[in-house]
Amino acid sequence: MPIVPLRGIELYYESHGHRGDPTVLVHGSLTDSSGWARVLPGLARGVSVLTYDRRGYGRSTPGPRPTPVRTDAEDLAALLEATDFYPVHLVGHSYGAAVALRLASERPDLVRSLALHEPPYVGLLADRPATAEFGRTFLAAIDPIAAQVAAGAAAAAARTVVDAFSVRPGAWDRLPEAARRTGAAAMDRWVEEYRDGEALRPDPAGLRETLVPVLLTVGEESPAFLREISALLAADLPNATLRSIPGTGHTPQLSAPDPYVGLLLSFLLERNVPQS
C-alpha cells in the first residue's frame, strides 16, 4: 500500500482508475480516505483518482501538533509533486474543501479546478451582520466540545458535531459503527481544525484571485448555515457555480453517491484534457 514520506511525516494514498485527468479527493474531519468508497467506482470510470489520508488521519502519521489548514495544504502540494500527479482537479468535502481552496489560492500551478462540498467557513457568517449571531454562537461552542474531548468523552463530542451538521435528528446514530469509531478517534483533530482561524475564514484576496473553475455543491437537506456559506462563496469566487444535490445533506458521498458522482463527472469531464 503506497506510503510517501514527506515533510517529516508519512502520507498514505491510493490510486484508482487510469484514464482522464488527475483528480484528488480531499476528505473532511472525523473520517479518512475510506469515506470515499461509495463514489470511487463511478469516478474512476471517468477520471484518474487519487485518495489520501490527511496527516493524523487513517494510515498517515500525525507530525507536530496542532495542524493548521496551511499545513494540510502544504502536505497536499508535496504529495502531488512527489507522485508527479498534477495539475489536478480537487474534490474537497467539508474541511477538506477548505484545504483544497487554500491550495488553489497558494499554488495555482498545481490546480486545474475545484469541486467543493460545503466548506465550513463559519467565520464568514460571524463577519456578516445578518448571520453574525449564529456564527458567534457556533464558534463559542467549540471550547465546550474541546472540554468534552479532553475529559475522555470523545464519542459524545463527535455526536454533538455530527448532529449539528444535519437537519435530521439522530445523524450520529445512523452512521455505521466503524464510522462512529473513526469519528470519535479523530475528535482531537476536529478541535484543532475548528480552532484554526485561517481554516474558518478564507482570505478575501485569495478568493478573488482563485480563477480556476469552481463547482460548489450543497445538500438540499443540509443545515441552512452550510448552504448560506456556499452561497457567499459563490458570490465571492470569480468563476464559481453553485449546485444543489437532492435527497442528501452534508455527506453526499455516503447518502447519495450516484447523484453526487453524476454531478462531479459532468463538471470534471467538461474540463478533461484530451489524452494524446
Describe the residue ranges of each PLM region:
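Helix-rich cap/lid subdomain of alpha/beta-hydrolase
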Residues: 119, 123-178, 194
